Amino acid sequence: MARKRGMQFIPYDYEAAYNKAMEDMHEWFIENLFQHRKKVIYALKEITAGDQFEIEIYPQFRSMDEAPPDGRTIKKDNNKAQKNLNDKNARKYVERLINENFSDRDIWMTLTYDDAHLPPDGDVDAAIKNVQKYIRRINYQRKKRGLPNAKYVYVTAYNPDAEIRWHHHIVMDGALDMETVESCWKQSSRNEVRRLQTDENGLSGMANYIVEEKNRVPSEKRWNSSQGLRDPRIKVVHSKRPAAGGSYKKIGSFVDGMVKDRDSIPEILKKWYPDMDFTNANVYYNDFNCMFYIHARMRKRRLQSEKTEKTGKTCRTT
């Protein structure tokens, strides 16, 4: 269903605006929210990253004054230019970037420093230069073997207050053997190199671990990636069919039922996306305008042959 011509909506941080969970809320409280809200248009955002599929349902506004105060900042989906992982949207972008470009055929490394090679306290530039030299060594070894340059995402971490030493998390494609990958790091011999392991959330667990660590130097460049990685795919719609072959209905017409009966969300989503398996969903609200934000996660259904191949694999951990 097309939007009316001239109808422009403002970008705002709906996750910050709607941050109160609906879990265990009494029915009378939910009904009270329905009675005090205004009419609004809801959008549905589909984010595809690898085999992970996220759904975000949120109200849209034409004026920032209509948005809850907590969400009155401009929200950008593509935060590749934002290298500060203290920013929540940058962390989400890195998680999705990893899911889109890597799998259990690839490698996750944690590279550390011995005392002789430890960068000075707070000198993030020195630490980043070390990891950039490492990437150049990797690419030299790959070129010798007729391989293209590495695909990677790296995160640099450090916290002097918590006595956490400099270290780098690197997710890299698995074309080069793990022994060579580890030997190219010259700053320490005590490192971890392991094959990635996906689960129902893809690589989100690992990605969230490396970006959420509380060991960051504020306002410094924290992460980077190789050129040519695929961006997560994002699509925004304002209507869906209740089931295959049905008529399109506005997204807002589904919201009340999802909020009142949260157990209905999996069935609704399975009808919208029959090729996906449901993982989880959460409903949030804000009493500023008595409106809702729904976040759900699904994953592409694997063929039986893919499941057999996955369960037959072995993983090495060092």
Identify what each model region corresponds to.
Residues M1-I164, G174-T318:
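Right-hand nucleic-acid polymerase module
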